[in-house]
Design a protein with these regions (language model features):
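Active-site glycine-centered loops adjacent to acidic/histidine catalytic or metal-binding residues
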Residues: 23, 143, 166, 188, ...
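AMP-binding/adenylate-forming catalytic core of the ANL superfamily
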Residues: 198, 208, 213-214, 236-315
């Protein structure tokens, strides 16, 4: 019901077209199927991840749902292509990104900026949208934290990207950004079917008809996470003055170093993975005086480039 409240105004009298590639057994994708049925949507299933872009030109999706890793890869590929451009084309791309982020943040554009943005729309954003079928109205990210820089970048180049939040125990969506009111640093307002509050220690608590009855044959584990009807998510967050939910950390993943400092590994891991040369990263440093990063590179040939990137981050 909460998802329908967001999507119905977006499509009005049109029937949405989905292109999906996530496993149908995944709780996120499983919930999306119910949304598709409720909307009477046309659904295309991608042949494979490798053929996703070519499938987009055939399906011409108006909406796609995916996990953050997909958007991270998309960002890396587009950014790599942009970085190869020179001269006027490079300046136009730079203006597209900066003015797009300004519009995303509801900042007023000057007369000159509006003039430049007109050409950015025609010469850059429209071409990018056409590569994705030309009809895309929303990417929806869920199943993990989407890096703010990636969200801003995709929105700025004409690919509207909404970040949502949920967990399997909440069937599985709790909140999502609203088209036209995107606050990319948040996961949007909670659905009206949910009650959300922040505990004294900062943990996000959720209550509603979408909360699970419990873990199958595991009463002890159930009682640990559901107390007085409130699901203890294990995530740390806050509610902004606009009423949006903002995730700041994962309760059990906080690193406490030898000096007693609390460090969020996910923020550092996301920063590392912004490099197109880094496939995955893992940060460790509990009860240590230092942090260690375990990095999976795209290929062994990228070692020197990764070292240069890390040196830049450490400055």
């Amino acid at each position: 019901e909460g998802a329908l409240d967001i999507l119905i105004p977006l499509f009005k009298n049109e029937k949405p077209v989905f292109l999906t590639w996530l496993p149908l057994s995944h709780s996120y994708e499983h919930a999306v199927q119910f949304v598709q049925i409720s909307l009477g949507a046309k659904v295309y299933y991608a042949e494979s991840l490798e053929k996703l872009l070519s499938n987009m030109s055939v399906a011409k999706p108006t909406i796609m749902t995916a996990v953050p890793r997909f958007y991270q890869n998309l960002y890396s590929k587009i950014y790599m292509n942009f970085s190869k451009q020179k001269g006027l084309k490079k300046k136009l791309i730079s203006s597209t990104i900066s003015l797009g982020i300004k519009k995303l943040n509801k900042s007023r554009l000057s007369l000159v900026e509006n003039f430049i943005n007109f050409f950015c729309e025609k010469l850059v954003r429209r071409k990018i949208r056409n590569q994705f079928g030309g009809e895309l109205k929303a990417f929806v990210s869920g199943g993990g934290a989407l890096d703010q820089k990636i969200g801003e970048f995709l929105n700025s180049i004409g690919l509207p990207t909404l970040q949502g939040y949920g967990l399997t125990e909440a069937s599985p969506v709790v909140s999502c950004n609203i088209p036209g009111k995107i606050k990319i640093e948040t996961v949007g307002p909670p659905f009206k079917t949910n009650q959300v509050k922040i505990a004294e220690d900062g943990e996000i608590l959720v209550k509603g008809e979408n909360i699970m009855l419990g873990y199958w044959n595991k009463k002890k584990e159930t009682d640990e996470v559901i107390k007085d009807g409130w699901l203890h998510t294990g995530d740390i967050g806050e509610i902004t003055k606009e009423g949006n939910l903002k995730i700041t950390d994962r309760k059990k993943e906080i690193i406490v170093n030898l000096g007693g400092d609390n460090i969020s590994p996910s923020k550092i891991e996301n920063l590392l993975c912004l490099s197109e040369k880094i496939k995955q990263s893992f940060i460790y440093g509990d009860k240590k005086t230092y942090l260690v990063a375990l990095i999976v590179s795209e290929s062994n040939e990228n070692k020197k480039e990764i070292e240069i990137y890390l040196e830049g981050l450490n400055k």
